[in-house]
Amino acid sequence: MVFACLLALAAAGRASAYTQQELSLRMDDGVDLAATLYEPSTAPPPAGHPAIVLFHGLGGKRQDLDFLARAFAGSFPVLTLDARGHGQSGGLVSIDGPREMTDVKAVFNWLAARPEINRNRIGAWGISLGGGAVLRSLVEGVPWAAVETVETWTDLYSALAPQRLTKSGAVFQFLNSVPQARLDPSVLAIRDDALASTNLGAVRAWADARSSRSQLAKVTTPVFMFQGRRDFAFDIAQARAGYRLLKGPKRLYVGDFGHAPSTFPGPDIAQVTSLGLKWFTRYLIGTPASFAPVSLAPSPWRGKLRTYATLPATRRLTIQLGGTDSLTGAGRALRTSGPLTARVETFGSPQVQVTAQLSGGWSRVVAVLTAKPQRGAELVISEGGVNTTGLTGKHQLTIGLIDVATLIPRGSRLQLYLASSSLAQSSGNLLYLNLPMPPSARVRLGPARVVLPILRSPVSR
């Protein structure tokens, strides 16, 4: 179904008359960025064409967004480019660092200087790494006229190291999506600490220089945030926090796509593309249009959104899970609830509260919350972890889990895994890796309480 949607979008782009030109843009340090410029064949209006720049994700290339460029090119000139260190571009990848921000400014200025382009009507669309670049460049003063971001971060540190424990598996995957020879020394300098949750002050400083949240309250530019329902790298909380801060026209779409365990494009790609084109048409051309402030796509996607005037209302479901377990090394505790009496859908960050007696250098507690339905496979609802380095003795731990929207069928039993890594739940669950701890490390876990924020009315079936 997704493939059919992409074919339809590409066909729509081919049916519209535009030209396509391959380019090489020279940066001020001598590095060349490979780019493609799509332009309508029609003559520009007196003030010039409004235009859009597309930014791809980490480890990607500009061709990943060909389907989107063609969908937009019937209405706008569209510039796609290989980010520094990616695809056919030169240079090294510093993951939206200062050098990449200089590149973004140069790309904007290059496009704005073209006689057929209206420099006051240039928009930006970015996914993941590209979304981070769009938001960071926006708060650094690049005068985008309208912005769209997809499955990205507003605060990179809180995304990758919530509660001072890095999502080591996600960090490993991201860093290995780019050949080591193409990583900038600034990334290599924090790589080992980012994997091991050590020297977190340096990791935070590095991440803060690539984040936008602290400055979003001054942004009045129209911003449309598209975030995935089940994205364990950059969760709904990243967009939710940014959405609340923005002062200009803003919209939030929580869709059926994302980083693992989801994919992009997802089954609602036609909806995402249609709304994206409508947003740019509204704020770059001025065509009147209305948008729901907040939209939530059901999973599986059935072609219809649930819309809200504000962020959806939720209530709390609290579940007590008794038991006591003593763990060493790769041991795990497993607690199971009774069956749920109704279908529920999470929306927000669940919490796990548990008493822990720590000794011998036990440095982390990871919680994986799953649902075991009456029929079908076990489903990971959410997961998270807390850094316990330096703690000894008895402590009441509160573990915040990832903010995702997950449908839990009626009759499901909740299963809570507590361990030192997410692999204790499944060998395929690589979000928190099983990193070494001292042989003397021990933890004794007491009863646990799970607090689930759930929608007052589920949107999925």
Language-model segments: residues:
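Glycine/threonine-rich phosphate-binding loop and adjacent beta-strand/alpha-helix elements that clamp
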Residues: Y18-S24, D28, A34, V272, ...
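Short alpha-helix in the alpha/beta-hydrolase fold that links the catalytic acid
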Residues: T221, F232-R244
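Catalytic histidine neighborhood in serine/cysteine hydrolases
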Residues: L246-P261
